[in-house]
Amino acid sequence: MGYCQGVSQVAVVLLMFPKEKEAFLALAQLLTSKNLPDTVDGQLPMGPHSRASQVAPETTSSKVDRGVSTVCGKPKVVGKIYGGRDAAAGQWPWQASLLYWGSHLCGAVLIDSCWLVSTTHCFLNKSQAPKNYQVLLGNIQLYHQTQHTQKMSVHRIITHPDFEKLHPFGSDIAMLQLHLPMNFTSYIVPVCLPSRDMQLPSNVSCWITGWGMLTEDHKRGPVHTAVPSRLQAVCCSGCRGQRVGSRVGRFRSMIVHSEGQLRSLMPGDFHLGDSGGPLVCYLPSAWVLVGLASWGLDCRHPAYPSIFTRVTYFINWIDEIMRLTPLSDPALAPHTCSPPKPLRAAGLPGPCAALVLPQTWLLLPLTLRAPWQTL
């Protein structure tokens, strides 16, 4: 098995949300749309050193980028996907569980044989030593490993240096480098990274996945099996300065900035414990990564949107990290064959978070104050 190598270029989609009036019109159109794809297909080339590719901006066909566009974003599973129901093995092969001392902490997303992305806030008040973290892929059940499971040690954790410098949860993105490259199989595949200037169609089908809590009873811990939820994203402009709620403490009002953040407009089931997990959209050729679950209000306040890190904003940073980070030494990779401990939702702060109901968020009272939390 070889050592982990960097990638020269990474690109992602530019996705922003519309002004109030435009949002209402676009939302009405989306709610009545029935032309959303509900199947995925495609063949999977194998190989431990294959790299995730970019999706071409001008087309939704399988345009080759560096000859590897047939690798990423194409699960083996073919069939309908139902929101809120357990995922099937191989259905979301880039979904990873980030383990902290053997317990599920956050979601993460495989973007290359040696790299995953997650969110910086997952590491707040936690040890920064990579030896305390592992990633689990090829698994849809956290308590039960199969022959498809790969559990890998983390070599390096790189959090964004500007996290919360400009506004709360700003630059909420982190990268994880593995000691050894992940072997791509029918159950472990990287997600595609779209090009910077690609425009998503208005009826694109987008999904969020994770093991987060499905109820407000946070004592129950995360669910055992990965659960997908459907989300329809609006691709427009004008997300600046939109107030989505209030935050207790030193920040009395929470403002969503277009710089590096997305907000959800559609109902779904993104909950506590899903932080760092993927928001992916399906094009005719493959699934592409659009956002990372960052934060939201708890289930008692459904009128507020959940917030995602807009990955496209960090394209240069991601590219630089993957190009310039030193290679890991495979001889130093620790043994990682032990089964995971029973999960206890490590470090999860309080009750669950849910996506906003689309028909209510545009009429939010600006004076309402509600508790905030990470997802």
Curated annotation (Swiss-Prot):
One Pfam family cited in the UniProt record for this chain: Trypsin
Presence of the UniProt keyword Secreted in the record: yes
Record localization: Secreted
Catalytic residues as annotated in Swiss-Prot or TrEMBL: 121 (charge relay system), 172 (charge relay system), 275 (charge relay system)
Enzyme Commission no: 3.4.21.-
GO cellular component, one term: extracellular space
SUPFAM superfamilies: Trypsin-like serine proteases
Disordered as annotated region, ranges: 41-60
Compositional bias (Polar residues): 51-60
Residues carrying a glycan: 183, 203
GO MF annotations, alphabetized: serine-type endopeptidase activity
Domain of life assignment: Eukaryota
Coiled coil: none
Keyword terms of this UniProt record: Disulfide bond, Glycoprotein, Hydrolase, Protease, Secreted, Serine protease, Signal
Disulfide cross-links: 106-122, 206-281
Signal sequence annotation: 1-23
UniProt keyword Thylakoid, yes or no: no
A biological process from GO: proteolysis
Domain Peptidase S1: 81-323
Family designation: Belongs to the peptidase S1 family.
Protein's UniProt name: Putative serine protease 47
Organism expressing this protein natively: Homo sapiens (Human)
Chain's gene name: PRSS47P
